[in-house]
C-alpha cells in the first residue's frame, strides 16, 4: 500500500510516485502480502480473522472479544457490509476446515478522525452477528494497556496474513508470518517524506532480506510482546523494501477509544479486557 495525495497511491506504489501522483488505490489493496516469511503451525495464531467480500479474502484483523474484531478502516471503503463475512479459526482459506467459524458483520465503527487520503487513524471495530466459541483454534489477542507506550526501535515483532507471498500474486499455502523489527519513527517519517503522523508505527526486516507485508494483509495485527501494537496500513510498491518501510496504525494511541466503543455497544457486564492470555500465543 503506497502513499499518495489521494489515497497515497495504489497500495504498492513507490515513494516517488506515491508522493507525486493523485492516484486512489483500489479498495483493499493497501498492505497486501507477507513477503520473506514462513507458514505458521496451523491455528497457532488463533486471534487471526479473515474478512471476505464476494467470497474472496479481502483483509485481516484480530479477535478482541467474542463478538469484536479490530481491523483497518480503509478495508471497508465503498464496501457493502451486508456482503461481508468474517472467518475465524482458519489456516488454509481455500479449505472448509472444521475449526472455522463464519460470521456476518452486524456493525462497523470507524474511528471518527480516519482520513482516507492519508490513512491517519486507520482503525475500525467490527461487531459480529454472533459470538465466537473460544478454543484452541479461536482465541483473543490483547491490545496494549491504556497507558502503554509504543514499542521502541529495534523491538522484535511479527506480522501475519493470507496475502500474496510475492510481488507476482502468488497465493500462500496457509497463514504466513514474518518477523520484523520496529523502526525509529523519525527515520521512517523521513523515508515517507514527512507524511506520517504520530499515531503510525513502522517496521523493517532487521537484516538484508526483504521481509514484511504488501496488500490483502491490511488490518492484520503487528504483535509485539504478545500484544497487538499495530494494524497493517500501507507500504511501498515492492514488498519489504527498506526504502519504503511498512507502516501500521499504532494501536496504543487508540486503546481508550477501542474500549469505549465496546462498552457503549455492549451494556451487559463482562470480564475485564486483557485478563486472559490468548490460547496458542507464542512469544
From Swiss-Prot:
UniProt xrefs under SUPFAM superfamilies: Trypsin-like serine proteases
Organismal lineage: Eukaryota, Metazoa, Chordata, Craniata, Vertebrata
UniProt-annotated location(s): Cytoplasmic granule lumen; Secreted
Primary role: Serine protease that cleaves preferentially after Arg residues. Can also cleave after citrulline (deimidated arginine) and methylarginine residues.
Name by which UniProt lists this protein: Serine protease 57
UniProt record similarity statement: Belongs to the peptidase S1 family.
UniProt keyword Hydrolase present: yes
GO molecular function, one term: heparin binding
Record annotation: effect of changing residue 213 to A: Decreases enzyme activity tenfold
Keyword annotations from UniProtKB, A to Z: Disulfide bond, Glycoprotein, Heparin-binding, Hydrolase, Protease, Secreted, Serine protease, Signal
Enzyme superclass (EC): hydrolase
Amino acid at each position: 500500500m503506497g502513499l499518495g495525495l489521494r489515497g497515497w497511491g495504489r497500495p504498492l506504489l513507490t515513494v516517488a510516485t506515491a508522493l507525486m501522483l493523485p492516484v486512489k488505490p483500489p479498495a483493499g489493496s493497501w498492505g497486501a502480502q507477507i513477503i520473506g516469511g514462513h507458514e505458521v503451525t496451523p491455528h497457532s495464531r488463533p486471534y487471526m480473522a479473515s474478512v471476505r467480500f464476494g467470497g474472496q479474502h479481502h483483509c485481516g484483523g484480530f479477535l478482541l472479544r467474542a463478538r469484536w474484531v479490530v481491523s483497518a478502516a480503509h478495508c471497508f471503503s465503498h464496501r457493502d457490509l451486508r456482503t461481508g463475512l468474517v472467518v475465524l479459526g482458519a489456516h488454509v482459506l481455500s479449505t472448509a476446515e472444521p475449526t472455522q467459524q463464519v460470521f456476518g458483520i452486524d456493525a462497523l465503527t470507524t474511528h471518527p478522525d480516519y482520513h482516507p487520503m492519508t490513512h491517519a487513524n486507520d482503525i475500525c471495530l467490527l461487531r459480529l452477528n454472533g459470538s465466537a466459541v473460544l478454543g484452541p483454534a479461536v482465541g483473543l489477542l490483547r491490545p496494549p494497556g491504556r497507558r502503554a507506550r509504543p514499542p521502541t526501535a529495534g523491538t522484535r515483532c511479527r506480522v501475519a496474513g493470507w496475502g500474496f507471498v510475492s510481488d507476482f500474486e502468488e497465493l500462500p499455502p496457509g497463514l504466513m508470518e514474518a518477523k520484523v523489527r520496529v523502526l525509529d519513527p523519525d527515520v521512517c517519517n523521513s523515508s515517507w517524506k514527512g507524511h506520517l503522523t504520530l499515531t503510525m508505527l513502522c517496521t523493517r526486516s532487521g537484516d538484508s532480506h526483504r521481509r514484511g507485508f504488501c496488500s490483502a494483509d491490511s488490518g492484520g495485527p503487528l504483535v509485539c510482546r504478545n500484544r497487538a501494537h499495530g494494524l497493517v496500513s500501507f507500504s511501498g510498491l515492492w514488498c519489504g523494501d527498506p526504502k519504503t518501510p511498512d507502516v501500521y496504525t499504532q494501536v496504543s494511541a487508540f486503546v481508550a477509544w477501542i474500549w469505549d466503543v465496546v462498552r457503549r455497544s455492549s451494556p451487559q457486564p463482562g470480564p475485564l479486557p486483557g485478563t486472559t492470555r490468548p490460547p496458542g500465543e507464542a512469544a
